[in-house]
Amino acid sequence: MNDKIKKEWFVYMIRCMDNSLYTGITTDVKRRYEEHEKGRGAKYTKVRKPIKICTVFQVEDRSSAGKLEYFIKNLSKKEKEILISDEKNKKNFINYAEEKLKIKIN
């Protein structure tokens, strides 16, 4: 019998001190953000210190997280800013991304 517990995966966007947006994936957003704050996260956030989490998406598995992360990272800065600007835009993005990527975003 397989008793593996299915991990939740998250895609998160962080605002950095230089006003840029960093996108990453994790199973624990709080822990990962703390790593970024302490300079133990990605090279990107070591240089561009994180100041806040802008948004978080929950997905079903690692594969879905990777697909969504890649998709977001390929958006323009303007598109990313629109995405995080309000809940309506986020919901519209979720609907579009679910259809385009064939994944479920919670």
PLM segments and residue spans:
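A structural signal for short, well-ordered beta-strand elements
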Residues: 25, 58-60, 73
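Residues at or immediately preceding the N-termini of alpha-helices
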Residues: 29-30, 61-64, 77
